[in-house]
Each structure stands twice: as structure tokens, then as C-alpha cells.
Amino acid sequence: VQGRELTQLQTILQKQSSRLGDHIFKDGSKVLGGEVTLDTEVTYLKLTTTDTASLFADGVISDTSVTVGAGTTRAQVVSAINLVGSDAPTLIVKFISGTSFTAGATIYLEGSTATTATIAAVAHTGGASIVSVNRGVYFVNGFFVLCAAQTLVLEKYSNTPTYRIGLTTTESIVDST
């Protein structure tokens, strides 16, 4: 099979796929997965300005360094936001056990007693809001497009967001070079 013939076959198959999709789906339709979830039950934890929030990304934090799961308060880190302007480094968390961390307390990344941070002394915790999109397939411009799972912090210091949530597409040409 020569390159020209292969290109013709790919074009024919794409056109058939596009026609089937156009018949069944509206442009931008969700085909498989891709559920959108708003979560206003997450909590922010402000750290002291000398700490780096990204060290805790996607980890589990605890109020004790003894062993994994031994802390009385444990939380899954949903998002870690480093120091931005006058905003302190902030962790967005979902509690596993307990309901809050004490102001000024030291937190530990489970499985690493060396990774610690100190919670800010004032205005250290409160409600936040995030939106998540699960992995899914959408029909866009005649193509079935895979969308990776994503989480976005809507309001890091409020659990009452006022946004419209959606996806945008970026088209690019990928070649062999």
C-alpha cells in the first residue's frame, strides 16, 4: 500500500465516521462519560507564606506524622495553589476523617514525614468550590474527541460560585516531524 492510497483510505473512513456522527449527534454532544460535577463541600486551608502548596498536590495530609492513617484529622488534597500575589499558599481539601485543622498546626504529607507545612494563624479555613469533568468522548466538528479528566478551582475562598462551565476546543495539525 502506497502513502497516497493509505491517505485516501483514512479520508474515506473519517468521512464515514463523520457522517454517522452527524446523523446521531449534535455538534458538541457528549458521547461517552464526561460527566460534570460541581463540589461546594470542599475546604480551603491557607498555609504560611513560607510554605509551598504544590508539594502536597494530590496527596493525603494528616495532623500527625506517626503512620499513614494515624492522624485524627485527615484530608485528600484536591488542588494545591502556591503563593499568588498577596494570597497565601492554599490547599483545597476534602476531609476523610475529622472536620478541620487547627490554626497554626503542622500538617504532614502521609508517607513522608519530611514534607510538612504550617497552617496560617488567622482566616485559615473555610468553604471553597471546584468543578470536575470526568474522562469522556465528545462529538466535535465531525470527530470523536477524547477529553481527559480535569478539575478546576472555581472559588478558592468561597463555596458559592457564579460561573457558567463549559469546554473549549483547540485544533492543531500533528505531523511526523
Where are these regions (language model features)?
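Subunit-assembly interface segments of extracellular/virion macromolecular structures
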Residues: 1-177
